[in-house]
Amino acid sequence: MTDLGLKWSCEYCTYENWPSAIKCTMCRAQRHNAPIITEEPFKSSSSLDPSLCTTQGGSTLLICPDSSARPRVRIADELPETSSKWSCHMCTYLNWPRAIRCTQCLSQRQQGSQQHSPLSPSETPQTSGSRPSPVTSDPCEEYNDRNRLNMHAQRWPCSACTYENWPKSLRCVVCDHPKPSGSPETPQQDSEAESATSPSIVNEQERENVRTAGGGGGGSRGRLRKLSPPMCKGQAEVKIELASGAVGSDNEQEADFKKLKQIRNRMRRSDWLFLNACAGVVEGDLAAVEAYKSSGGDIARQLTADEVRILNRPSAFDAGFTLVHLAIRFQRQDMLAVLLTEVSQQTAKCIPALVCPELTEQIRREVAAALHRRKGEFPCYFFTDLVTFTLPADIEDLPPNVQEKLFDEVLDRDVQKELEEESPIINWSLELGTRLDSRLYALWNRTAGDCLLDSVLQATWGIYDKDSVLRKSLNDSLHDCSHWFYTRWKEWESWYSQSFGLHFSLREEQWQEDWAFILSLASQPGASLEQTHVFVLAHILRRPIIVYGVKYYKSFRGETLGYTRFQGVYLPLLWEQSFCWKSPIALGYTRGHFSALVAMENDGYDNRGAGANLNTDDDVTVTFLPLVDSERKLLHIHFLSAQEMGTEEQQERMLRQWMDCCVTEGGVLVAMQKSSRRRNHPLVTQMVEKWLDGYRQLAACPTLSDGEEEEEDEDE
């Protein structure tokens, strides 16, 4: 048996691979365990052994010819009976009469398949128009060789992915590229040259005669080729090993390149956005993740083996990984928070800023006009107007079902549940929530990196930072007052690290590098912001900001990943106290997302005294914001200097200096947030009224229909 017989043919691309290969060298397909007879029968006395009908793996071949179908003993003066064979209409392969499918391409046998006419003993198998050729050692081998050469010669290569397609294919079966208009059907000379240098014909010791190497068409198919002289078995093995070593690596690289090109050609825009998002998680590019989310991409999508191959970074990407897995693996807490933020899609959100676009644009212009830069050594931006947003008290006059619909469309139910039920962070005091009417509601906003800026404007003006006016002021203030904020930030970070037992010192270059990163976040629309930016926003608002947030980052499995460090009080410490307002705003923080916490208007104070003399009129709404957590521990004051840090009593004294504080009858230290509808901005009041009119109309419809029914009953 020759070395050629050891090769196995790929069932996908018909490439003949070396026996040691477990995958196809061309298309990387797995080796099939139940091979179809694709090689010509070999001239050997062992062919009479019936055991050859079974492969080494024990699987039975599809066709096992015996002595009754075709005599396996070759007689010099006797030719096989080929008249009973039928030719496949797809690949022209000559199959045995008992086969119901083609051995090569598995095509169904047609009724009345064309059979070859019997040959006279003096004729040799050849087509018309070709000169006679010497009789081969085995006529069946001759026909099988011709069929393979015909099949290869008639294929046309795809100009996009180089895959060789069948001649009847009008488009490439791999990349769907159209067939070139001038594709040659039978490249005669190429097939002859390829057959002469084909690696599948290495050393044929048993073929001593000259045989035909023609293609599938007529013409000059009778060109002769003389085989190389026979060599010993050891030399043949050495030659095969050298060929597989030298050519195999090049073939594998070429096959990998072709496979990669095929995968790229099949990919769509959504696939590229997903791969960019995966790379963005690894490299820390949040914009790529946001681009994938905004396009409607599935966050739970998993990487496939082909996509991992395109990314070409096995140390970072594995098949089956999602964006959440990558964010956990590379500790991207900000991205993890964005990815895990679940926004309910069951109800369409309907907030005042979306219902009244004309009024909203006017309010945005008012916001831009209210921002000014102070002259002097500290050129920070600041607001000239004190505006506080509250939900109207008329909501309580609506029917319960309309109220439920309103809250579903204006509140973030997931944030409200996490801050109230999963962790007692807000509304934990029955005294504040019920008797003092200081229940806080989490407004819904965008889930992108602008959620901090959106929540600040929602808590004051009731709108989004759509035009990035507040972000621009934040960026300019950070750069213009960089020295002031940098000193506070550096001193605070050093103290905070030491408070957790982390005694280390950084070089000034490292501090500057971290500070440059904080500055860059402020200038990038959509980038998530940090504690320093909340501190700067307190100066722009000229009022304190109280953040009620979760204490720990948690994975989607509920595992604690680290401290959030956002909860606490942010005071405008770099301004003079006389230049600032004492009425704070409240924000909620959950898993990398900020939400505005607002109260509902109340009808005056009545007997709601909280241990303080409230000499105000009935039009003013006072919301009592707790300055302690549910465990009655004082909230931290962020970015204090070394001189300002002291005991808890000293920090409480500082809170009383910057805010109007009092202690309730239950002993809770609270800060008073004051707002007045009469003193509020008229555009904000008009926007809220127009938004509320839509729910009033919903409440009026059932009443109207009930009244009509009553009138009809009276008429009867």
UniProtKB/Swiss-Prot annotation:
State where Zn(2+) 3 binds. C158, C161, C172, C175
- Entry EC number(s): 3.4.19.12
- Any one biological process term the GO annotation gives: protein K63-linked deubiquitination
**Listed Pfam families:** AnkUBD, OTU, Zn_ribbon_RanBP
- Assigned GO CC terms: cytoplasm; nucleus
Q: Where is the composition biased (Polar residues)?
A: 118-136, 183-203
Q: Where is the active site?
A: C451 (nucleophile), H593 (proton acceptor)
Q: Which residues does the annotation say bind Zn(2+) 2?
A: C88, C91, C102, C105
Tell me what this protein is called: Ubiquitin thioesterase zranb1-B
Give the encoding gene's name: zranb1b
User: GO terms for molecular function, please?
Assistant: cysteine-type deubiquitinase activity; K63-linked polyubiquitin modification-dependent protein binding; zinc ion binding
